[in-house]
Every structure is written in structure tokens, then in C-alpha cells.
Amino acid sequence: KLKNSILEIKEKETDCNIVYSFNRLNNYCGKWIRHCGLYPDKKIRIWNRNIGMWEGKIHETIKFSKETKEVRLHGDLLHYSFNTHEDFRNQSFRFAEMKGESYFSKGKKNASLLKIISPMFFFIKNYFLKLGFLDGKDGFRICLVYAQATKHKYDTLKRLYNCQSKQHK
């Protein structure tokens, strides 16, 4: 379905200020994940390269140089993300560490309360409110790793502030 949507836009002459998005369906250890906050995993991935570029260390956002109009394409991009739970956990923690470093470089303060509340909130939101339990044991494992990675992000931020304060003594 997505392939046909892309072929349709290629055949048409389109406005260069239009950006195209679609849903990404993630595969975790051989299983399609439709909950846990991972679906629909909307991504903008098609745009005129003269009006936009990636910004951030881990492709966090796309920055457009002018006003754009987003058009949603039909179909899912099948994303074979992780073959093993360990791969998933390692990448989640690597991205969390990068996010903690980003917070530090932007001067975000280390809030001890956030370190406690955010992981719990993240788990509750994704496992219960976003129906992660419907993905069974895998849904539980995914939500648990994301909660742990959220804590790791704040641990990284705290570690960086501790290192900074030791250097200033």
C-alpha cells in the first residue's frame, strides 16, 4: 500500500513545500508491535531536500527552512528494528545517554524527582494507556526497557553535573 502511495506522488507534479509522512510498523524480535506507543509511529521521510534537513544527534527532528504542508501517505513502512531484546535494550540506553548529554549541553537542570517519576509515568502511559499489554510479554519487555532508559537518561544528566562540579572544586 505504501509503495503505491509513493508511486502516485512520483507520477504527479507536486508542490515543493509538501512533505510526506506515513506510519512505521516496528518489528521487535520477529513480532509486529502495534501498541506500547510504537504504532502508529508517524514519520516524515519524504521531502524536497532543498527545504529541510536533519537536526540533532540521533535524527531527532527535521528542520524546514519554510512553511510546509504535511500529506499523510497510505500504508505502513515495515521497520525491522531489532532481532534480539539485547539489541533493543542497548540502542534504547545509547539513545537515552545521548538525550541526557543533550539535556546537559542545553543547561537542563538535573531534577531528582523527574528521575523517579518519569520512568514510572512512561511505563504506565505506554503499557496501560497505550495498550502495551496487548502485545503480550514483548509489550511488557519493551515498556520496561523504555522506563529503564528514561531513568538512564536522568542518571546520565546527573553524572555529567557531578563531573562538572568536581572539576570546579
Language-model features, listed with the residues they occupy:
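Catalytic-site signature of metal-activated, phosphate-bearing donor transferases
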Residues: 1-164
